[in-house]
A protein has these predicted regions:
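ABC ATPase "signature
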Residues: 3-8, 15
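Short, flexible active-site loop motifs that bind/organize anionic cofactors or intermediates
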Residues: 2, 11, 43
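C-terminal boundary and immediately downstream tail of ABC-type ATPase nucleotide-binding domains
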Residues: 13-36, 45-47
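Non-catalytic connector elements of ABC transporters
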Residues: 28, 37-124
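Short, solvent-exposed coil/turn linker segments
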Residues: 8-11, 32, 49, 115
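Residues located in well-ordered beta-strands
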Residues: 8, 20, 34, 66-70
Length: 124
């Protein structure tokens, strides 16, 4: 085995040095360099944590994607969603309340967005 990163748990979670480390603690979505270029005109692979993926928000974010819901897990105060767009898999959390209620169904298409400040470049 090889040690990928030595750091505090908080730094490993917030600033992983590789896709392996990003996926080791918590949930994340890894966007490959090819997909980053094709869909976002971005030149590096990156990870995005589900808590930073906004659902059906304004398209004024740095990254926007329309994807289909492929899995829904009710977890009490939130829904954990898995979304697909071609080869891209995105994990997102949806926190329902009376002002943002949307219909969640497998196969439904929804708009996703996130800001550059919330991604981690993986340089892989």
């Amino acid at each position: 085995g090889k040690i990928e990163q030595i750091d505090t748990p908080i730094n490993i979670y917030n600033k992983p040095k590789s896709a392996f480390v990003a996926d080791f603690i918590g949930t994340t979505s890894i966007i490959t360099k090819n997909d980053a270029l094709s869909y976002f005109n971005y030149s590096s692979s990156f990870s995005i944590r589900p808590e930073f993926v906004m659902i059906n928000q304004s398209k004024n974010s740095d990254f926007n994607l329309t994807a289909n819901i492929s899995d829904i897990q009710f977890q009490g105060s939130l829904y954990k969603l898995l979304l697909e767009k071609d080869s891209i898999l995105i994990n997102a959390y949806y926190y329902p309340n009376s002002s943002n209620s949307i219909n969640l169904e497998i196969g439904e298409s929804i708009n996703l967005s996130w800001d550059k400040i919330n991604i981690t470049d993986l340089n892989e």
